[in-house]
């Protein structure tokens, strides 16, 4: 009987070990390629501003990303450019607004981590916006709106429509100089309640609540955990390009896709209501 019990115990142990597969560390969920010259370390808190692609380089519309409580990132629709905000769950959102002559929209964050873009009229004395191969500098008063985050971590951006006054003179476009690590972020925006504030540590994005920035199964950009949401595609491999835009792997093109009164952010287009954008990194200042 003793040997029979020992045999059964050994058999059950073998079955358990065979069925067990150690989970893959989320930090290894990274793209196979990297951004050439990208910065993977930036421990000072910074925000994100949405720069939609336009017909000409001189027309720059910047919406700051906000984040709702669950970590999702969204962009709301408003008449002024807004920073990305974050709602409570970590989602990122961007509201829709009309862009003034020179405006920075900062993403805000709500309780769950989602990101949203609120409408703030904070004035910035000087704003320099880096875009591929070019740098747009404006010394006139600028409206800076930080992206917000809702409670779940989602990132949202409110809907904004660019006005004709958002055209910048081509004479102010200058080649971008190669930045060092301290100067990789060249744009500043006013920080307000709910503004998405993140740091970059060894290629991992972390929001002010300690949640991890990731591209989840449906390709949406949001903050969760740690660990990231189950089924996440990427949780590491983030960097800031030499132009000051956020990148995942070797890609710095994201998509804001309309969802009701706000946009969600994705690393790929998921349909006809999506538009390509750059996520400009911005320094956060109290105004």
From Swiss-Prot:
Its main location: secreted. The keyword Secreted applies. Residues 22-62 form a propeptide. The record marks 72, 91, 114, 154 as: Covalent attachment to cell wall glycan. It is found in: Secreted, Cell wall. Keywords: Cell wall, Cleavage on pair of basic residues, Repeat, Secreted, Signal. The record marks 62-63 as: Cleavage. It comes from the Eukaryota. GO terms for cellular component: extracellular region; fungal-type cell wall. The keyword GTP-binding does not apply. The PIR1/2/3 repeats are required for the covalent linkage to the cell wall. Their number varies among different strains of S.cerevisiae. Belongs to the PIR protein family. Component of the outer cell wall layer. May be involved in meiosis and sporulation. This is Cell wall protein PIR5. It comes from Saccharomyces cerevisiae (strain YJM789) (Baker's yeast).
């Amino acid at each position: 009987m003793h040997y029979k019990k020992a045999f059964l115990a050994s058999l059950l142990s073998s079955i358990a070990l065979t069925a067990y597969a150690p989970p893959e560390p989320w930090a290894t969920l990274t793209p196979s390629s990297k951004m050439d010259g990208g910065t993977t370390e930036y421990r000072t808190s910074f925000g994100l501003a949405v720069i939609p692609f336009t017909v000409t380089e001189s027309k720059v519309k910047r919406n700051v990303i906000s984040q709702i409580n669950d970590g999702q990132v969204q962009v709301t629709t408003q008449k002024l450019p807004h920073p990305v905000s974050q709602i409570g769950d970590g989602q990122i959102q961007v509201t829709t607004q009309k862009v003034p002559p020179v405006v920075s929209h900062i993403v805000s964050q709500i309780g769950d981590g989602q990101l949203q873009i609120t409408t703030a009229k904070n004035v910035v004395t000087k704003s320099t916006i880096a875009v591929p191969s070019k740098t747009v500098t404006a010394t006139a008063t600028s409206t800076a709106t930080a992206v917000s985050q809702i409670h779940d971590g989602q990132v949202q951006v409110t809907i904004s429509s660019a006005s004709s006054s958002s055209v910048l003179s081509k004479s102010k476009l200058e080649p971008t100089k190669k930045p060092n690590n301290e100067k990789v972020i060249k744009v500043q925006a006013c920080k307000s309640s709910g503004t998405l504030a993140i740091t970059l540590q060894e290629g991992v994005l972390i929001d002010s609540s300690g949640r991890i920035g990731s591209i989840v199964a449906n390709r949406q950009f949001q903050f969760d955990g740690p660990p990231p949401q189950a089924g996440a595609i990427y949780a590491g491999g983030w960097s800031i390009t030499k132009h000051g835009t956020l990148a995942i792997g070797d890609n710095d093109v994201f998509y804001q896709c309309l969802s009701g009164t706000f946009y969600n952010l994705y690393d790929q287009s998921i349909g006809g209501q999506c538009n390509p954008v750059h996520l400009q990194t911005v320094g956060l200042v109290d105004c």
